[in-house]
């Protein structure tokens, strides 16, 4: 079935390794798709062979034989990869087939071919041609292609046999050839002459655009050009500029759809405007060329867009300009990442276009202007794109896969920014090969000289505008204003707290104020630091810098230096009697003059003048926007000083209202933060500090280097350091608090969570139809426009029942039912639930009331009956009770009305009809007079009800034999009514109907004269329509459902979706336009090699616990499994397995519950279904609307053939508005290697015919063609769709399902040069259409009900949202659907949920810093395709490629909004290792962002408050996380210093030192961050908002019980480690996290490898610090808060060491522990080497683990060594604590002696190591004796020391604590200096030492886990904690089953 091993196959390694070799060939040759890439031309022949095989095997054989011959011609030497195997397999098959087919042959091969060709032409092609309407053009296109191949084979066979081809056949072939030129596969628009009858080509807007494009009047065609039919402007551009044919076809369709969609919005009634509207052209042109015109203006060049003076030619010229841009863009490949490079190319080509059209003469040649790169085939690709592409590829190669420093190669941004300078025009046109853009590095030049290559250019240009240098200083440099603010605030607060009263009001005292003013000296120093940093970090871009930028750097540095001198000088003179530093300065400059504070203040005012100006501009953003865009020299000079002139980052400022909102947010936050810091941290710390500084300490426990130092500065630093770190970090906590409150309020105002439960939905259901129609149905013109805004949203009320009832009810019913039936298709609800939820499809004109879904009316009739029966004649009371429950009233009214209609329909007889009419009219009279209960006896109603139910049941079965029974039932009913209910009124009534003939007969009447009541009945009902069936079924439900439907639907996901959708209809959203007038859009999904569809083998494959994915899913989704069995009509799983045809359904069911491509495609194709239904509701006439969409769907097969039918029009509109492209990068490789995934992708294309797949096709050029040897590879960007299913000629059964290529555009080389995914998106973006582009990941999902809101969402692109510009990215809300899998998945989904809701809500409004975070956002497609695409692709720096799209959009004056009335599903990682990998990837990405130019520019170009928002919501979060961990380190190392030096003992009598409140406050803040407080706050607020605060509280408690704090503390370590390592050393890489279900146990060795450096090493270091502190720290045992602080750090240690085992499924199961230990031992002792993967050997893993140091540069290595020195502190401090040396003076020789001991031990270890290598083989006994002797000596010394009291057991423990860290520190330094150590020959010893440490760490971690595994209840507890209960139960069952199976099999063997 499936060839994949398990659910998660390994991704293909490299490109094509041995994929197409013998392993998967042989019989697989039947598959025409498994063809080596160099033989791709023979695939169509093999396809035809498969197609004709059923009808004529001999012809199929001849086709295959011809294919073999052609393959031999293409590659005679079989040099291509896999060609020899392919030919051999094909030949083997031909030998077999020749014998079998010869037997059945009646004529010669030539005759056989000829007769078959004639038969095919007449029977098949002519039949299709003669078919009415030629509607099935797809089959016709396919037939022409097949006929062309058959003729090719026929010709070859005839040549072989020397037979002439008959004239008749030649004639037929000529016709076929003509037609196959016209009938080519198309994407959306068939543009051939025969396509006029296609529905989409009938639209006036399409016709208008096509005819405008075909206006080629006056275009100068080259001489000798052959005219083609229907030639258009793009053909002319192709001829003149040499674009590729498929590129032209692709962009032709693109341009037509774009213009047609914009045109129709200008003219809602298309008939009004037969010509293409100029306004539409102007709109598209403005969007397309906005960036180009801005570029021209920036560089001071005139744009090349010259329009003619003759009005008639303007439209043609505009179309040519647009066509040219799109053709350049469509073929630009990787150049699309360089938008200004495209502007440069376009600038010159548009100028040439203008020259040709204006008939200009070239001054150089004297001839008419011609394009510089002529019009031959592929000229544009070869001569324009390829040279630039090669430069990109060369630079990418220099990056060495991201290992090189960023400063050593130019990334996409550098290459693009070359075109931001006027110098780019030096490149020339035609481009000069020796231009500096193309030039090489010094090394390359040297190589070229040595090889005597021609010179191509001088030195390498270097980086442009910015250098990404790996340094922490980027954090300060990018956000210098924020750091300056914090440093100056800290200084001011310390000064205020230190001086005077220490109160804030003290600032107004003269001296204090003057001291506070010293902050300006600090400000000047910080300015100088920034200026120096700017120069240092930009040094490597100096070659590309313009002179005025260099000048600015120098001026800035000089000015800052002057201020640094001037400020302290004037400050010193402002004091009468200065002290300290001020006094020194004053003495230097002769300080006898009088003081002058006012002079210092004047200097400050001058210093602040630029800031005052910027503050003024900050208050008036519109002035700032104008100035930044201005070209006036004076303005440019002024702006030049404040910030360098740059093409992007200008005019980003928001409106005054937005500015006010985010400024208020930050003002409140900063006041709170600074007040807390002052009162809780700084002020209380001043007094203890003063006290400590006064105390003199003379006794030290160690050798003190500065015994006479004053003020105890070491103690002061140890005290203040953690507090200051927390001061810089705690803004993140305040941000979490304030953003949670603001986000909660914002959400409440947006009406989130108004409908949270089913009960709330029921109570609001009556206003739902009106809300539906208000939001999802376009407004008619006559209606008043809706009010907008928050207040309007709150005051908006919906009528209980709509006024124009019929149509609105019908529309509501169609959409509501579509949603409910999608629930059923997804198996969220059962058949019964679906019946209860559906609203009648067919409108019943006879019922004058709205019919609610039965789940609202269920059990209402039986209850109403009881109430009526017990009412005792009190009418009013019953009415009152009915009026309280409106649904009951509806149910009663509907039942009565339906009963009336039904009886009137059934009874045909005249007299019975009169009686019935009379009864009904009497009842109606009673109802009107409200005397029903008083006058009638309703106690008999139950009898009537019973008879009515029986009648309905007979009607449902509708059998002829039941007619007599129905008569009896009707008579019974008549009797109940006349005798029991209307007893009093019967005689008069019957008399009136019998005209007084109501007499008693005494005589027997003959039979034929007897009157039989109800003899004439309309039964059985022969014209049983769907509407009739539905009506009867509904009536039966209303009457018989006795239990309440309160829990319908019972599935939690269905409830969540229904309530969210209903709630969203009451939120504010734009009005829905008609489908015809909506904005068109595409969805783009990048896919690499993840699961497409689970295979049966993958589903049933069991893990070690006997749990398969299928079993797991059945337990997780039990109700959905039951619903699935019901849907496929199976009673049990066994029955399902027995039916082979349901295997596919089972695979689909499982795949829809995983993170698979199938799930994503189904979700996104809901957009199309929604659009089709909405198009129907827009276009249907009243009669069709009342019949319903279902009726239309039932006739869809026939209707789609006719271009005029409503169904065809709906389909065509959906095509025009929506495209879905999946970019399957590896599809061709997978297809050629017979990979199951390729088949599954093809199956998706067949299921969804409008789905398109784009892929990169890699074709090997064969030796014969190649001019550079056999390895030449050609790359194409291709788009395919499913071909019509090929049917056998003699039967209608389909033979094969294939794809067909629509476009195939050649690329200049391999597309993947950077991060991979961005380039995968980029190559396929040319196949997308429309004005919006939604980027969707392959682990996302969509829902039918959400798809209905898409047209509303797209309208947001036309609204300014209170800002100054319309949105360029629409952010969408996500729902994380993987939360039910395990407790970890639940934490992760809650965390992610809060980010994608409340987090992004606050980012978008009020903060205005939402960017693009992964994928459900909708991009303004035209905006982004002209500005570099939807992500950035440079290797490593753009690791988080998505967020850079948001940065880019914002910097280019875009606007990102967030909308919460629509949601998309999203899968997340579910196991600890997967989650940690994801977190590591994000932390790595943030590390790279810190170095990036985008963040630097945002930090400098935003105003102060928006810059703060940007920092704290991007890298600030990660830096604060790192500071949190750093605080713990600094605190503990500070304590270590105090304890070991003896200072703590000396200060222990200081009360203030003991109860240190500020330290407690600081570390409490740190603990908040540590345990996930930052995550929990917004999470709780969002859950409270959407599900109620009591649920939030329950969830919070449950999360704590499931150890959420452990999880968040653990993730803290992950973020810190990977963010820090990326900043220090680089090594960031994409980490594939997998999308599987984690139901497996991770081995101990795997956990060790993954967490060793990030958690375990750090955890052990902290543990040693804590242990030392516990042993020697005395002072604070009693203080409660202090214990809490210590507990929180111990909690961190334990979490970092043991969380991976705690969250590991079956982590405490004894058998697993034993297996893990064996596996770990094997791994740790395995030798490494070349080709040994890290998973197999510790040595390989260790080498890889320290690999990052190789590329980290000198700075990184020095930093690593400096950080390693901290481990030597332990030894220095602890040696002096040994009991032997306590009495001695604290001499340095003691420390020296300890080093002697360490070196002695190391020498012995080294000696033993050498001995092992030299002697262990030949002198094994001798070596053993030596080893024994060494051991005994060591043991003897130890015993002697203990006996002589020279050492105590405590000393031994201390020695271990001292020497372990020292060894580790030496190891770290040795690793950093690896090249040096290797040269010295000590590397093997270092490796041995490292292995020893790893073994020790492994033991330390393994022992407690193994100990706990002894107790079975620990494992039980863990399973309960880790998985929800259903699965825990399942796990046990599965183990038992596994056991039983084993028992059975063993018995069978016996």
From Swiss-Prot:
Q: Which GO terms describe its molecular function?
A: 1,3-beta-D-glucan synthase activity
By its UniProt entry, which SMART domains does this protein fall under? FKS1_dom1
Topological domain spans for side Cytoplasmic: 1-481, 527-552, 620-655, 735-1511, 1582-1591, 1677-1682, 1777-1787, 1849-1851, 1916-1950
> Which GO cellular component terms, listed alphabetically, does the Swiss-Prot or TrEMBL entry include?
1,3-beta-D-glucan synthase complex; plasma membrane
The EC number(s) attached to this protein equal 2.4.1.34
The listed locations are: Cell membrane
Q: List membrane-spanning regions.
A: 482-502, 506-526, 553-573, 599-619, 656-676, 714-734, 1512-1532, 1561-1581, 1592-1612, 1656-1676, 1683-1703, 1756-1776, 1788-1808, 1828-1848, 1852-1872, 1895-1915
Catalyses which reaction(s): [(1->3)-beta-D-glucosyl](n) + UDP-alpha-D-glucose = [(1->3)-beta-D-glucosyl](n+1) + UDP + H(+)
What family does the Swiss-Prot or TrEMBL record give for this protein?
Answer: Belongs to the glycosyltransferase 48 family.
User: What role is this protein assigned?
Assistant: Involved in callose synthesis at the forming cell plate during cytokinesis. During plant growth and development, callose is found as a transitory component of the cell plate in dividing cells, is a major component of pollen mother cell walls and pollen tubes, and is found as a structural component of plasmodesmatal canals.
Protein name according to UniProt: Callose synthase 2
> Which species is the source of this protein?
Arabidopsis thaliana (Mouse-ear cress)
Q: What is the lineage of its organism?
A: Eukaryota, Viridiplantae, Streptophyta, Embryophyta, Tracheophyta
């Amino acid at each position: 079935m499936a060839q994949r091993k398990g659910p998660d196959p390994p991704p293909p390694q490299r490109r094509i390794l041995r994929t197409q070799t013998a392993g998967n060939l042989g019989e697989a040759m039947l598959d025409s798709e498994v063809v080596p890439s160099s033989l791709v031309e023979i695939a169509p022949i093999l396809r035809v062979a498969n197609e004709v095989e059923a009808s004529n095997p001999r012809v199929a054989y001849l086709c295959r034989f011809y294919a073999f011959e052609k393959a031999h011609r293409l590659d005679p030497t079989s040099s291509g990869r896999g060609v020899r195997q392919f030919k051999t397999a094909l030949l083997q098959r031909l030998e077999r087939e020749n014998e079998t087919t010869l037997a059945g042959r009646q004529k010669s091969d030539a005759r056989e071919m000829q007769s078959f060709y004639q038969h095919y032409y007449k029977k098949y092609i002519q039949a299709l041609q003669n078919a009415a309407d030629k509607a099935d053009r797809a089959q016709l296109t396919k037939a022409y292609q097949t006929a062309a191949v058959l003729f090719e084979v026929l010709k070859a066979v005839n040549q072989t046999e020397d037979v002439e081809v008959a004239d008749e056949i030649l004639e037929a072939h000529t016709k076929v050839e003509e037609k196959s030129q016209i009938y080519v596969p198309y994407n959306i628009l068939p543009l051939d002459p025969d396509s006029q009858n296609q529905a989409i080509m009938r639209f006036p807007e399409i016709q208008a655009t096509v005819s405008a494009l075909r206006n080629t009047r006056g275009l100068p065609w080259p001489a000798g050009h052959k005219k083609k039919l229907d030639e258009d402007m793009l053909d002319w551009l192709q001829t003149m500029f040499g674009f590729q044919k498929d590129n032209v076809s692709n962009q032709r369709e693109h341009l037509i759809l774009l213009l047609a969609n914009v045109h129709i919005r200008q003219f809602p009634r298309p008939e009004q405007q037969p010509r293409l509207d100029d306004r539409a052209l102007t709109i598209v042109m403005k969007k397309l060329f906005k960036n180009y015109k801005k570029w021209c203006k920036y560089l001071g060049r005139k744009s090349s867009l010259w329009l003619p003076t003759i009005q008639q030619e303007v439209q043609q010229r505009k179309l040519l300009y647009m066509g040219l841009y799109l053709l350049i863009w469509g073929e630009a490949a990787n150049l699309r990442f360089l938008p200004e490079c495209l502007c440069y190319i376009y600038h010159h080509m548009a100028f040439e276009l203008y020259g040709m059209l204006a008939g200009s003469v070239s001054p150089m040649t004297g001839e008419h202007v011609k394009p510089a790169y002529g019009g031959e085939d592929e000229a544009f690709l070869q001569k324009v794109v390829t040279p630039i592409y090669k430069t990109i590829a060369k630079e990418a190669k220099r990056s060495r896969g991201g290992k090189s420093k960023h400063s050593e190669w130019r990334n996409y941004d550098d290459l693009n920014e070359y075109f931001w300078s006027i110098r780019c025009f030096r490149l020339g046109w035609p481009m000069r090969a020796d231009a500096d853009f193309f030039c090489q590095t010094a090394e390359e030049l040297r190589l070229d000289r040595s090889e005597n290559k021609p010179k191509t250019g001088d030195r390498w240009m270097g980086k442009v505008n910015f250098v990404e240098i790996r340094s922490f200083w980027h954090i300060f440099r990018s956000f210098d204003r924020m750091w300056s603010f914090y440093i100056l605030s800290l200084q001011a607060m310390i000064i205020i707290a230190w001086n005077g009263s220490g109160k804030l009001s003290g600032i107004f005292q003269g001296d204090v104020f003057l001291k506070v003013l010293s902050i300006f000296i600090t400000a000047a120093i910080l300015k100088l630091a920034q200026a120096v940093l700017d120069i240092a970090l930009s040094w490597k871009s100096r070659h590309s810098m313009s002179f005025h930028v260099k000048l600015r750097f120098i001026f800035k540095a000089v000015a800052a230096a002057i201020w640094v001198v001037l400020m302290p000088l004037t400050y010193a003179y402002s004091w009468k009697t200065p002290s300290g530093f001020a006094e020194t300065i004053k003495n230097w400059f002769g300080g006898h003059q009088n003081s002058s504070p006012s002079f210092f203040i004047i200097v400050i005012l001058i210093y602040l003048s630029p800031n005052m100006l910027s503050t003024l501009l900050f208050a008036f953003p519109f002035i700032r926007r104008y100035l930044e865009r201005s070209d006036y020299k004076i303005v440019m000079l002024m702006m030049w000083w404040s910030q360098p002139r740059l093409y992007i980052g200008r005019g980003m400022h928001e409106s005054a209202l937005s500015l006010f909102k985010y400024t208020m947010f930050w003002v409140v936050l900063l006041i709170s933060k600074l007040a807390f810091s002052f009162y809780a941290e700084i002020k209380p710390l001043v007094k203890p500090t003063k006290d400590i500084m006064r105390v003199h300490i003379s006794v030290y426990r160690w050798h003190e280097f500065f015994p006479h130092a004053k003020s105890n500065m070491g103690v002061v630093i140890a005290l203040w350091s953690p507090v200051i770190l927390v001061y810089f970090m705690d803004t993140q906590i305040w941000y979490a608090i304030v953003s949670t409150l603001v986000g909660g309020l914002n959400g409440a105002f947006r009406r989130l969570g108004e409908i949270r439960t089913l009960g709330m939905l029921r109570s609001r259901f009556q206003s739902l139809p009106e809300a539906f129609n208000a939001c999802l149905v376009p407004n008619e013109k006559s209606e008043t426009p809706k009010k907008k805004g928050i207040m309007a949203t709150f005051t908006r009320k919906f009528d209980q029942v709509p006024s124009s009832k019929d149509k609105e009810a019908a529309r509501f019913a169609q959409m509501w039912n579509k949603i409910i039936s999608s629930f059923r298709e997804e198996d969220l609800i059962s058949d019964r639930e679906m019946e209860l939820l559906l609203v009648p499809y067919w409108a019943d004109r006879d019922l004058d009331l709205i019919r609610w879904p039965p789940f609202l009316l269920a059990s209402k009739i039986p209850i109403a009956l009881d109430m009526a029966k017990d009412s005792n004649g009190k009418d009013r009371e019953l009415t009152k009770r009915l009026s309280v429950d409106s649904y009951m009233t509806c149910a009663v009214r509907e039942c009565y009305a339906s009963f009336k209609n039904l009886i009137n329909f059934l009874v045909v007889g005249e007299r019975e009809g009169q009686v019935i009419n009379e009864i009904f009219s009497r009842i109606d009279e009673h109802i009107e007079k409200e005397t029903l209960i008083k006058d009638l006896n309703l106690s008999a109603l139950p009898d009537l009800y019973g008879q009515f139910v029986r009648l309905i049941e007979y009607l449902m079965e509708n059998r002829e034999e039941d007619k007599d029974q129905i008569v009896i039932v009707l008579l019974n009913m008549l009797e109940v009514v006349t005798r029991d209910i209307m007893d009093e009124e019967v005689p008069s009534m019957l008399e009136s109907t019998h005209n007084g003939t109501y007499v008693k007969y005494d005589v027997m009447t003959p039979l034929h004269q007897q009157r039989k009541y109800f003899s004439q009945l309309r039964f059985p009902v022969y014209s049983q329509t769907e509407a009739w069936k539905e009506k009867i079924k509904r009536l039966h439900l209303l009457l018989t459902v006795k239990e309440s439907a309160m829990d319908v639907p019972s599935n939690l996901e269905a409830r969540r979706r229904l309530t969210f959708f209903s709630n969203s209809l009451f939120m504010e959203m734009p009005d829905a336009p008609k489908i015809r007038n909506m904005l068109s859009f595409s969805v783009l999904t990048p896919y690499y090699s993840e699961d497409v569809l689970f295979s049966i083998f993958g589903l049933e494959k069991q893990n070690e616990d006997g749990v398969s994915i299928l079993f797991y899913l059945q337990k997780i989704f039990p109700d959905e499994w039951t619903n699935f069995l019901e849907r496929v009509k199976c009673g049990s799983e066994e029955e399902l397995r027995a039916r082979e045809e349901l295997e596919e359904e089972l695979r689909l069911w499982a795949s829809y519950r995983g993170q698979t491509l199938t799930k994503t495609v189904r979700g996104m194709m809901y957009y199309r279904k929604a659009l089709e239904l909405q198009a129907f509701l827009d276009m249907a006439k009243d009669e069709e609307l009342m019949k319903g969409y279902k009726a239309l769907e039932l006739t869809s097969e026939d209707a789609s053939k006719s271009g005029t039918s409503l169904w065809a029009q709906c389909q065509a509109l959906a095509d025009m508005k929506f495209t879905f492209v999946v970019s399957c990068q590896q599809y061709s490789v997978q297809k050629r290697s017979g990979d199951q995934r390729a088949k599954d992708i093809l199956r998706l294309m067949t299921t969804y015919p409008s789905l398109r797949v784009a892929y990169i096709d890699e074709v090997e050029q064969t030796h014969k063609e190649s001019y550079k040897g056999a390895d030449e590879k050609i790359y194409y960007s291709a788009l395919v769709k499913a071909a019509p299913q090929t049917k056998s000629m003699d039967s209608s059964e389909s033979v094969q399902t294939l794809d067909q290529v629509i476009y195939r555009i050649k690329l200049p080389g391999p597309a993947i040069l950077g991060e991979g995914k961005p380039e995968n998106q980029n190559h396929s973006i040319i196949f997308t259409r429309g004005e919006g582009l939604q980027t969707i990941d392959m682990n996302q999902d969509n829902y039918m009900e959400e798809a209905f809101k898409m047209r509303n969402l797209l309208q947001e692109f036309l609204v300014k949202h209170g800002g100054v510009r319309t949105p360029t990215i629409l952010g969408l809300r996500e729902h994380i659907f993987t939360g039910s899998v395990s407790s970890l998945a639940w934490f992760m989904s809650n965390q992610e949920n809060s980010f994608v809701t409340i987090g992004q809500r606050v980012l978008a409004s009020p903060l205005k810093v939402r960017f693009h975070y992964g994928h459900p956002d909708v991009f303004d497609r035209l905006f982004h395709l002209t500005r570099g695409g939807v992500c950035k692709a440079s290797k490593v720096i753009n690791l988080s490629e998505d967020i850079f799209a948001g940065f880019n959009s914002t910097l280019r004056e875009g606007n990102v909004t967030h909308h919460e009335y629509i949601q998309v599903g999203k899968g997340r990682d579910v196991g600890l290792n997967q989650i940690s990998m994801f977190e590591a990837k994000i932390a790595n990405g943030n590390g790279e962002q810190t170095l990036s130019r985008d963040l630097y520019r945002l930090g400098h170009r935003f105003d102060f408050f928006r810059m703060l928002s940007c920092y704290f919501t991007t890298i600030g979060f990660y830096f604060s996380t790192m500071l949190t961990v750093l605080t713990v380190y600094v605190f503990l190392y500070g304590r270590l210093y105090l304890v070991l030096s003896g200072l703590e003992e000396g200060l222990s009598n200081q009360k203030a030192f003991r109860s240190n409140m500020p330290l407690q406050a600081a570390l409490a803040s740190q603990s908040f961050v540590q345990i996930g407080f930052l995550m929990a706050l917004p999470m709780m607020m969002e859950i409270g908002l959407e599900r109620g605060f009591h649920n939030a509280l329950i969830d919070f408690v449950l999360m704590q019980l499931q150890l959420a704090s452990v999880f968040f503390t653990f993730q803290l370590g992950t973020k810190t480690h990977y963010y820090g390592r990326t900043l220090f050393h680089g090594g960031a890489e994409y980490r594939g996290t997998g999308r599987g279900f984690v139901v497996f146990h991770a081995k101990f060795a795997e956990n060790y490898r993954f967490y060793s450096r990030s958690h375990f090493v750090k955890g052990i270091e902290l543990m040693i610090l804590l242990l030392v502190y516990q042993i020697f720290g005395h002072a604070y045992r009693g203080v409660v808060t202090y214990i809490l602080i210590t507990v929180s750090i111990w909690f961190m240690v334990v979490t970092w060491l043991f969380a991976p085992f705690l969250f590991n499924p079956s982590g405490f199961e004894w058998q697993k522990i034993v297996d893990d230990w064996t596996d770990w031992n094997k791994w740790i002792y395995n030798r490494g080497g070349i080709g040994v993967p890290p998973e197999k050997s510790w040595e390989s893993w260790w080498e890889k683990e320290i690999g990052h140091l190789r590329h980290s540069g000198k700075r990184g290595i020095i930093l690593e060594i400096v950080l390693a020195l901290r481990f030597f502190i332990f030894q220095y401090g602890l040696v002096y604590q040994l009991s032997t040396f306590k009495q001695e003076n604290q001499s340095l020789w003691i420390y020296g002696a300890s080093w002697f001991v360490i070196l002695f031990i190391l020498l012995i270890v080294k000696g033993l190591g050498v001995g092992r290598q030299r002697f262990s083989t030949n002198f094994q006994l001798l070596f053993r004796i030596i080893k024994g002797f060494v051991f005994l000596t060591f043991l003897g010394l130890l015993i002697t020391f203990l006996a002589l009291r020279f050492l105590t057991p405590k000393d031994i423990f201390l020695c271990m604590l001292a020497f372990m860290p020292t060894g580790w520190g030496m190891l770290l330094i040795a690793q950093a200096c690896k090249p040096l150590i290797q040269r010295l020959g000590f590397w093997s010893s270092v490796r041995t030492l490292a292995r020893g440490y790893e073994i020790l760490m492994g033991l330390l971690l393994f022992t407690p886990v193994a100990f706990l595994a002894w107790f079975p209840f620990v494992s039980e507890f863990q399973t309960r904690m880790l998985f929800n209960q259903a699965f825990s139960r399942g796990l046990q069952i599965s183990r038992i089953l596994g056991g039983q199976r084993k028992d059975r099999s063993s018995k069978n063997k016996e």
